[in-house]
Amino acid sequence: DLMQFETLIMKSGVWYYGSYGCYCGSGGQFRPQDASDRCCFVHDCCYGKNGDIVCGGDDPCKKQICECDRVAATCFRDNKVTYDNKYWFFPAKFPPQNCKEESEPC
């Protein structure tokens, strides 16, 4: 859940990453701005490969979604030093021309 995710990354996931760089938050796209933003790119790619899956019980797809979250949380934690406040609310603070370089494919 979100609280466990935030504990692992040692930051508030929604507050710090809900609108960070070009990729974190809703509708992420274009080239990630730094290693923290890249964590969101990798997480989105992981979910994209698995589709919008809602699973329960011992279903293996639930395990894969949890693995996407685990990898992302570890990525955020390991790259916490790259977090740069200039990218916080980046798309909102700056015009979208800052997020226009295409990202590599997943």
From Swiss-Prot:
Disulfide bonds join 24-40, 39-75, 45-106, 46-68, 55-66. Snake venom phospholipase A2 (PLA2) that induces inflammatory response, with local edema and release of cytokines IL-1 alpha, IL-6 and TNF-alpha. Does not exhibit myotoxic, anticoagulant and antibacterial effects. Release of pro-inflammatory cytokines may be due to mast cell degranulation, and edema may be induced by arachidonic acid that results from the PLA2 catalytic activity. PLA2 catalyzes the calcium-dependent hydrolysis of the 2-acyl groups in 3-sn-phosphoglycerides. The active site is at 43, 69. Belongs to the phospholipase A2 family. Group II subfamily. D49 sub-subfamily. GO terms for molecular function: calcium ion binding; calcium-dependent phospholipase A2 activity; phospholipid binding. It is an enzyme of class 3 (hydrolase). Pfam families: Phospholip_A2_1. This is Acidic phospholipase A2 PhTX-III. Ca(2+) binds at residues 23, 25, 27, 44. Optimum temperature is 37 degrees Celsius.
